[in-house]
């Protein structure tokens, strides 16, 4: 498992054990991948969003500095602390020259800091202009990776339980299989799902990624791509899949508040569970299971037409350049971005299975060595409809945190009254946070 050695805590005060989109550890990521600054060449300061990719970004920064002489500093924010850390760092005299937002909602907060990328070299490398993040007539950001998540599963364990992927085409099928495994878990020696940990290293999988499904289907039904007033049309479906996870997992649901992302990884890699909700970025943590033994299913919630549903594919990773940086630093940052997606060293680190394992929306994207990426591509080639990442329209981090807290309370005591807390967090708090964001 990949352990992060350099994590910058929120406000540079609190270090969190974390696993944002996969495994990580703790520490301070304020080490510089460069030495003395040559102001004539400019310099780069990248505030990285992904703790699980910290080590690779540090290596890539060093490689670029060794090759060009341009100093590159990479600082990695702790899981769930990026926005807080970005606010803190932007207030400093040497602020990040390269940062990221998650899409339109994030851009609304930082648009006044974004350099217009129109005419920059990196835009010429994109495979589609849909990865440009617009602010009016300006191009404020560029998506640098696409990722996919779903229900990763162990083929051998599923087969031992008497099933294959072909037996699971809907929520009803998944429920049948999971509950059957639970009934026979002592005989089989494993559970259906890894623990749905709700500590800060794991809760994003459910308050954000799982919550994406009911939002996506509501948007599809209403023919919209964003809203300031979510209705919660598919909240019953959200409850059904959450119930399935927490009542057919490796631990009692009352223990989930203290379960971590590392716990789930350990449970999956030691064959304690068949299913593990995560994405293509998790491959490095679970590779020991074996490429031929890894599968991935759509996350079914019982929505209409889900038999044609694919995996959840998208991006919430848009690079933005700080327009308040010096002219030299802006150019150095633009050059670094372009090098990352065009050079042999950059693309290998970004796309390779031994690197970050990204699929990048640029012409030099490499054929993936990550079997989970290939599974995602296979779903699309067979005509399944990818589930858009609608969580970039979630109104705020506070909304996610409130939803996560309500889910945790409900898991410990699964009553209708406690589910009402989830409904309130989902619907009422959405409207409240959306209204606050527009003030």
Model-derived segments and spans:
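Extracytoplasmic "Venus flytrap"/periplasmic binding protein-like
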Residues: 63-128, 156-162, 169, 267, ...
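Extracytoplasmic/periplasmic substrate-recognition and gating elements
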Residues: 67, 161, 288-353
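A structural signal for short loop-to-beta-strand junctions that line the ligand-binding cleft
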Residues: 89, 96-97, 122-158, 189-191, ...
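Hinge/lid segment of periplasmic solute-binding proteins
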Residues: 102-153, 205, 209-211, 295-297
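Short, solvent-exposed loop/beta-turn-alpha elements that line the ligand-binding surface or hinge
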Residues: 116-130, 193, 197-200, 215-240, ...
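Extracytoplasmic/periplasmic solute-binding protein
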Residues: 140-144, 149, 175-227, 273
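Conserved C-terminal helix/tail region of periplasmic/extracytoplasmic solute-binding proteins
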Residues: 159, 183, 360, 366-367, ...
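Glycine-centered hinge/linker elements that transmit conformational signals in sensory
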Residues: 178-179, 224-258
